[in-house]
């Protein structure tokens, strides 16, 4: 039987309660005092008459405002809540004392190690989990959690061990043990895959920190709601396919199919049947399958003149004929095209139909190269590090202090895809818990070899010149990391270089990174 006594803060009140229980020969099993004015009593069951009499006498004690029965003592309630939480967790969880002996194990851990709760308490963590010195870690008086890759029964787990501190009598935090959680890398990978699959809400996958990329995303949001053909241009690896899919998801056609065809990856004779279908085989083409939705034609600059003519006809009235059939089919499809080529130059050289270019160029989205978006490089790096570490089931490495300087000054000729591949390669070969510049393979990059695309030629002559000048300074500053060395390399005064670096924010960027 448990009672909750509401009372005032009066000296001697608790003693009077205890004296009353002694007087009635009641066996007290436990007492807990809450600082906010509540006393909890736990004693054996009483007959109704004795219980009613006891309640009346407790209420007559000076300072007692009320008394009532409760199902649990506060400590019992907390213990039951914790037990329910641990039982509900799908991940194995262990509680360790300062000798790394197991004090508590949830059902998931009992199942993993094939032991009962009692048998688990007879083991230390090291007897069940190899590859980590638990005792040495506890003796080091850790303040933060630590992650470690471990193998248990042939399964890969990410082990996270967290120190448990309690406040001692002198108000200092004392280490009393640790909590170990084991997360299956297979389960984590599936969860990440499901999350990635579900988190396709339009532009949520696109990193946009710089003002220029924010403007591009905002422009894309507006263009996404329209039905006219959309032309997306940009260098290789800038994310044209990602923007195309985002535009579909942000459009009224989001619930309808989205299909993509790379015009450079399949032979010319196969492109026609892929897009328009093949009647003798009963095959539906992309346009028919995506009726009501969107179709991305990637690398549109690689499309043959004959297919350009057929595409132009389809764009004009939305009708086409399947290969081997005279019957016309009408569909409602938004066509999104992407290219890294300069279509204007191709038109001038007779390699691309002028009328098709103007039909596609109604709505245009130009994606800038990553070298023009230095503010986006580290957020992209952090995103890919987190993503690939989680997928591989390894702890996320810390990024070294000098990594930002190197990555933001590199030219990234392959743009976002280049960053993604470089980070993936680095993580698969990383030894240790810190990602450093030497861990990332960055081939020599010559800014002078970069092709001048349409996006580079935007704006006035001063804007184009400034953009190119900033790119040159950014690249050379990597190899000549002082204003005097850079000035000597370029044959100008130290003051002139200092002013230019300040103008483009390169000197401030270096200071902030240092």
Curated annotation (Swiss-Prot):
PROSITE patterns: ACT, SIGMA54_INTERACT_2, SIGMA54_INTERACT_4
Free-text function comment from the UniProt entry: Dual transcriptional regulator of the TyrR regulon, which includes a number of genes coding for proteins involved in the biosynthesis or transport of the three aromatic amino acids, phenylalanine, tyrosine and tryptophan. These three aromatic amino acids act as effectors which bind to the TyrR protein to form an active regulatory protein. Acts by binding specifically to TyrR boxes in the promoter region of the target genes.
Domain PAS residue range list: 78-120
Quaternary state and interactors: Homodimer. In presence of tyrosine (or high concentrations of phenylalanine or tryptophan) and ATP, it self-associates to form an hexamer.
A Pfam family annotated for this UniProt entry: PAS_8
Keyword set, alphabetical order: Activator, Aromatic hydrocarbons catabolism, ATP-binding, Cytoplasm, DNA-binding, Nucleotide-binding, Repressor, Transcription, Transcription regulation
Gene Ontology cellular component annotations, sorted alphabetically: cytoplasm
Gene (UniProt): tyrR
Compartment(s): Cytoplasm
Annotated residues for binding of ATP: 234-241, 290-299
Residue ranges annotated for the ACT domain, each copy included: 2-72
Primary localization: cytoplasm
PANTHER family tied to this protein: HTH-TYPE TRANSCRIPTIONAL REGULATORY PROTEIN TYRR, TRANSCRIPTIONAL REGULATORY PROTEIN
Gene3D superfamilies: 1.10.8.60, 3.30.70.260, Homeodomain-like (1.10.10.60), P-loop containing nucleotide triphosphate hydrolases (3.40.50.300), PAS domain (3.30.450.20)
Record-linked NCBIfam families: HTH_TypR (TIGR04381), PRK10820.1 (NF008085)
DNA-binding span(s): 482-502
Example GO molecular function: ATP binding
Gene Ontology biological process terms, A to Z: catabolic process; regulation of DNA-templated transcription
Protein name: HTH-type transcriptional regulatory protein TyrR
Cited InterPro entries: AAA+_ATPase, ACT-like_dom_sf, ACT_dom, Homeodomain-like_sf, HTH_TyrR, P-loop_NTPase, PAS, PAS-like_dom_sf
Domain (Sigma-54 factor interaction) ranges: 206-428
């Amino acid at each position: 039987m448990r009672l909750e006594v509401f009372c005032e803060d009066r000296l001697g009140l608790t003693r009077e309660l205890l004296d009353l229980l002694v007087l009635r020969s009641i066996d007290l099993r436990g007492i807990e005092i809450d600082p906010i004015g509540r006393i909890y009593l736990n004693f054996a069951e009483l007959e109704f008459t004795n219980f009613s009499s006891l309640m009346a006498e407790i209420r007559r004690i000076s300072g007692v405002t009320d008394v009532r029965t409760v199902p649990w003592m506060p400590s019992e309630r907390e213990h039951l809540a914790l037990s329910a939480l641990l039982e509900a967790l799908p991940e194995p969880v262990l509680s360790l004392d300062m000798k790394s002996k197991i004090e508590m194990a949830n059902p998931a851990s009992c199942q993993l190690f094939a032991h009962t709760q009692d048998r688990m308490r007879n083991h230390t963590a090291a007897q069940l989990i190899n590859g980590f010195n638990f005792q040495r870690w506890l003796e080091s008086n850790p303040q933060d959690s630590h992650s470690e890759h471990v193998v248990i029964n042939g399964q890969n787990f990410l082990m996270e061990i967290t120190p448990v501190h309690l406040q001692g009598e002198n108000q200092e935090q004392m280490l009393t043990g640790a909590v170990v959680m084991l997360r299956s890398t297979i389960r984590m990978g599936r969860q990440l895959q499901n999350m990635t699959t579900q988190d396709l809400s339009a532009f949520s996958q696109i990193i946009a920190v710089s003002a220029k990329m924010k403007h591009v995303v905002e422009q894309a949001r507006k263009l996404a709601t329209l039905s006219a053909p959309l032309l997306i241009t940009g260098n290789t690896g800038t994310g044209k396919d990602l923007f195309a899919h985002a535009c579909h998801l942000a459009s009224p056609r989001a619930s309808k199919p989205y299909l993509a065809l790379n015009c450079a990856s399949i032979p010319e004779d196969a492109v026609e049947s892929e897009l328009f279908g093949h009647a003798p085989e009963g095959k539906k083409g992309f346009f028919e399958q995506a009726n009501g939705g969107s179709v991305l034609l990637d690398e549109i600059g690689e499309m043959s003149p004959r297919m350009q003519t057929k595409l132009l006809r389809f764009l004009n009235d939305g009708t086409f004929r399947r290969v081997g059939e005279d019957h016309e089919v009408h569909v409602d499809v938004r066509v999104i095209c992407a290219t890294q080529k300069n279509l204007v130059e191709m038109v001038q050289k007779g390699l691309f139909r002028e009328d098709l270019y103007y039909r596609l160029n109604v709505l245009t989205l130009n994606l800038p190269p990553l070298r023009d978006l230095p503010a986006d490089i580290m957020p992209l790096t952090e995103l890919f590090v987190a993503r690939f570490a989680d997928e591989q089931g390894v702890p996320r490495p810390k990024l070294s202090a000098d990594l930002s300087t190197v990555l933001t000054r590199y030219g990234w000729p392959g743009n976002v895809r280049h960053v993604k591949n470089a980070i993936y390669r680095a993580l698969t070969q990383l030894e240790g818990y810190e990602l450093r510049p030497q861990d990332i393979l960055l081939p020599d990059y010559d800014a002078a070899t970069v092709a001048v695309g349409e996006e580079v030629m935007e704006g006035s002559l001063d804007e184009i010149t400034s953009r190119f000048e900033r790119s040159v300074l950014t690249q050379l500053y990597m190899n000549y990391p002082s204003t005097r060395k850079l000035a000597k390399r370029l044959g100008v005064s130290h003051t002139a270089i200092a002013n230019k670096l300040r103008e483009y924010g390169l000197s401030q960027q270096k200071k902030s990174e240092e």
